[in-house]
Amino acid sequence: MFVNFILIILLFQCSINIKENNLETNKNTMLVHFIDVGQGDSILIQVNKKNLLIDSGPNESEDKLKKYLKKLNISKFDYVIATHPHEDHIGNMSYIINNFEVINFYAPKVENSTKAFETMAESLIRKDLKIKILKANMKSIDLGNNVIIDVFSPLSNRYEDLNNYSPIIKISYKNTSFLFTGDAEELAENEVLNAGFDLKCDVLKIGHHGSSSSTSEKFLNASNPSIAVISVGEDNTYGHPTDVVLSRLKEAEIYRTDINGNIVITSDGLSLK
């Protein structure tokens, strides 16, 4: 109960490079790393000498995440986003909070928490880090040099399914754009569609690891990506990605962490080389 009370207080306060080479950034390059954390999500964006982390994957993948970040010599995250309270997305957030300098920490306001979320919150309290609320129509986050983050959801404070708290986020760099969806289900997708947001993107991170409950035909038609990335565990017990979603993606170039491992997409602001 004490942790839940503290949580409430806190909450209110481009080339495809699947071999992981050429990871150095310069002032004209944005790197988007889809880190292979098994059945979960962890995405690192590097641009303008800034590091942005979206989710941290499940705790069982901690060693993978550690090795990947160590290879990149990362010591600081300018922005960290916890999309929703499920362990496969925030299982390593305590490791991130405890071992790296974190400047800004974002998460949606949720009515219910999980053990993984409470563990994360305890680490935030120890580091005296406040959670900044992610919600639709909040002010865009400007990363400089024409890199903008727009947040399209959540559009409600109450969802029965925690997946729908996942923020649908668009990161634009000049003429290129990436759409990140966490585990947002069709309900959240429809809310964003009905709100009239510009979902068109070059790269779409497929929702909920390729579950049939996400990435609806309407959402896919609106986003119309040329590249689709699925973060998913090899031989997972959920049957992800589903054949239904894969068939919907027939017009896109598909990359999967269970097949390709770590995936890196590079943008120069004009194209994905």
Regions found by a protein language model. Give the residues of each.
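Non-globular, low-confidence helical/coil segments that flank catalytic cores
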Residues: 2-273
